[in-house]
């Protein structure tokens, strides 16, 4: 016996509607994830084009004026003596140009540049492979140097201080240490967590320099330079709009420039003006102070659940669902820099400036925009 459905032709059953609704939610989440990633200071694997935007000389390098002056003196002195640069350690939040500065130094010295990361140096043979092939004046750059394994770090001590590689030959009672002379080289380390470095390693660097967040006018110049390299039409007002939402970070500024360029090509005539930049970045949920949804969530949770603080890092992480290290290394530095968050002995506290930006009033515990 045939069974005839009473549903109208073409009508969706509840299962189909649920599948489509789930698909829309997944698409929405994916779109938000893409937008949220715009403000991550770490490099994305897809950002290979960033290499073409890097300055090659100190003269091309924009910002970090005091650091450039110190480094230019070090370069001139080393050249005059015919010696390699002293070992250098750069620290600061991600995305500020530590790798770029290291590459520029090598170029200015006319030296070969070798780059690696601490997590890639798992065993002594990994670091030994780099050290034995370095020639006079070569530069070895180790990113995330605070993550070096202890046994690898200890191999660096005589290499940095005496240009000697000590290796153990044999096992047990027959084991002996053999020293291999090394060419005089320059080690440049970079870290976002200078406090995580051991004193013996930190003390072996001739210079320890901090990279600061960039000023809006410096970022605007970086955006203008990158736009020229990308053959993108932009005026100064458009560059300034992108710059002020870039969290003081060149990597983010270049990333936002590329997304605004896409928006200008699809929704406009290809030229980036202040209005076009503002419209694009609002679409990507980047507000005028460079805050994204996660930044606002962190601040809002502090206000609405804890009266503005103080709140401990672990508590913040548990309530927001974010990793404590991510909060401390990705979100907090910029919120501290712009005066929206304070660290106290008892925990994190939201400032009046943050309350005003989020739309809170003194009379109401809830945000005006909620």
From Swiss-Prot:
Region of interest called Small ATPAse domain (RuvB-S), as start-end residue ranges on this chain: 215-285
Q: Which InterPro entries match?
A: AAA+_ATPase (IPR003593), AAA_lid_4 (IPR041445), DNA_helicase_Holl-junc_RuvB (IPR004605), P-loop_NTPase (IPR027417), RuvB-like_N (IPR008824), RuvB_C (IPR008823), WH-like_DNA-bd_sf (IPR036388), WH_DNA-bd_sf (IPR036390)
Entry annotated with the keyword Protease: no
Instruction: Extract the SMART domains matched here.
Output: AAA
Q: Which residues bind Mg(2+)?
A: 99
Q: Give the EC number(s) under which this enzyme is classified.
A: 3.6.4.-
Q: What sort of enzyme, by top EC class, is this?
A: hydrolase
Residues annotated as region Head domain (RuvB-H)?
288-370
Residues recorded as binding DNA, renumbered to this chain, are 343, 348
Pfam families hit by this protein:
AAA_lid_4, RuvB_C, RuvB_N
Taxonomic superkingdom: Bacteria
Subunit structure and binding partners: Homohexamer. Forms an RuvA(8)-RuvB(12)-Holliday junction (HJ) complex. HJ DNA is sandwiched between 2 RuvA tetramers; dsDNA enters through RuvA and exits via RuvB. An RuvB hexamer assembles on each DNA strand where it exits the tetramer. Each RuvB hexamer is contacted by two RuvA subunits (via domain III) on 2 adjacent RuvB subunits; this complex drives branch migration. In the full resolvosome a probable DNA-RuvA(4)-RuvB(12)-RuvC(2) complex forms which resolves the HJ.
The record's comment on protein family reads:
Belongs to the RuvB family.
Q: What function does the entry list?
A: The RuvA-RuvB-RuvC complex processes Holliday junction (HJ) DNA during genetic recombination and DNA repair, while the RuvA-RuvB complex plays an important role in the rescue of blocked DNA replication forks via replication fork reversal (RFR). RuvA specifically binds to HJ cruciform DNA, conferring on it an open structure. The RuvB hexamer acts as an ATP-dependent pump, pulling dsDNA into and through the RuvAB complex. RuvB forms 2 homohexamers on either side of HJ DNA bound by 1 or 2 RuvA tetramers; 4 subunits per hexamer contact DNA at a time.
Query: Which protein, by its recorded name, is this?
Result: Holliday junction branch migration complex subunit RuvB 2
Which organism is this protein's natural source?
Synechococcus sp. (strain JA-3-3Ab)
Q: Which gene encodes it?
A: ruvB2
């Amino acid at each position: 016996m045939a069974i005839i459905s009473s549903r109208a032709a073409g009508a969706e059953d509840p299962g189909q509607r649920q599948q489509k609704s789930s698909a829309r939610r997944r698409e929405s989440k994916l779109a938000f994830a893409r937008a949220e990633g715009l403000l991550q200071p770490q490099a994305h694997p897809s950002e290979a084009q960033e290499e073409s935007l890097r300055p090659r000389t100190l003269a091309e390098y924009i910002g970090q004026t005091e650091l450039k002056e110190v480094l230019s003196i070090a370069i001139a002195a080393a050249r005059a003596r015919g010696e390699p640069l002293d070992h250098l350690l750069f620290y600061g939040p991600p995305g500020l140009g530590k790798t770029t500065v290291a590459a520029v130094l090598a170029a200015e010295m006319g030296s070969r540049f070798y780059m690696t990361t601490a997590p890639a140096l798992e065993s002594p043979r990994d670091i030994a492979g780099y050290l034995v092939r370095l020639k006079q004046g070569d530069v070895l750059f180790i990113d995330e140097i605070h993550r070096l394994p202890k046994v690898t770090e200890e191999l660096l001590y005589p290499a940095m201080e005496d240009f000697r590689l000590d290796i153990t030959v044999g096992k047990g009672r027959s084991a002996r240490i053999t020293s291999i002379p090394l060419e005089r080289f320059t080690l440049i380390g970079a870290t976002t967590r200078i406090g995580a470095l051991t004193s013996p390693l930190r003390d072996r660097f001739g210079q320890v320099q901090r990279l600061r967040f960039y000023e809006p006018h410096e970022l605007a110049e970086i955006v203008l330079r990158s736009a020229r390299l990308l053959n993108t039409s932009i005026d100064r007002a458009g560059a300034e709009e992108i710059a002020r939402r870039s969290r003081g970070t060149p990597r983010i500024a270049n990333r936002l420039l590329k997304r605004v360029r896409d928006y200008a090509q699809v929704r406009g005539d290809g030229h980036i003006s202040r209005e076009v930049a503002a419209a694009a970045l609002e679409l990507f949920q980047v507000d005028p102070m460079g805050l994204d949804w996660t930044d606002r969530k962190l601040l809002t949770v502090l206000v609405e659940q804890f009266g503005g603080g103080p709140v401990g890092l672990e508590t913040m992480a548990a309530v927001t669902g974010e990793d404590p290290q991510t909060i401390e290394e990705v979100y907090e530095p910029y919120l501290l820099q712009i005066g929206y968050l304070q660290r106290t002995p008892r925990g994190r506290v939201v400032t009046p400036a943050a309350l005003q930006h989020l739309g809170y009033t003194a009379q109401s515990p809830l945000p005006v925009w909620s």
